[in-house]
Amino acid sequence: MKVLEDLYYSKDHVWVKVEGDKAYIGITDYAQDSLGDAEYIELPEVGTEFTAGDVLGVIESAKAASDVYIPVDGEVIEVNNAVAEDPSLVNSDPYGSWLVAVRLKDKAQVEKLMKAEEYKKFLET
């Protein structure tokens, strides 16, 4: 499984990339592999506010429908419509195909997520 060094990871197999007070959020290589070929992705609207642990959206595949849990508090400021229109992008490029960008409410929450090495160890358990 591919794990990128410059991202943060949740136990729900969601990655977070921080740029200032903005965070891009997507699913990991492990998550997309477990789900199989994504057929439909439901994403929130810009302006929606979330608390860490809330369901951010849903990814449906031939295997299953899976909720995507947001690991940080924030307000959606961008939605990746390309992924909604072509869900297979999360399979072919899970780390390049972010789902949403949020304005972080508490940057300290990001530091509580796993870094790449911790996430790799988590995957081994």
Swiss-Prot record:
GO terms for biological process: glycine decarboxylation via glycine cleavage system. Keywords: Lipoyl. Binds 1 lipoyl cofactor covalently. Transmembrane segments: none annotated. PROSITE patterns: BIOTINYL_LIPOYL (PS50968), LIPOYL (PS00189). SUPFAM superfamilies: Single hybrid motif (SSF51230). Its cofactor is (R)-lipoate. It holds the Pfam family GCV_H. Residues 22-103 form the Lipoyl-binding domain. CDD domains: GCS_H. The modification N6-lipoyllysine is found at K63. Coiled coil: none annotated. The keyword DNA repair does not apply. The glycine cleavage system is composed of four proteins: P, T, L and H. HAMAP family: GcvH. The glycine cleavage system catalyzes the degradation of glycine. The H protein shuttles the methylamine group of glycine from the P protein to the T protein. Belongs to the GcvH family. This is Glycine cleavage system H protein 1.
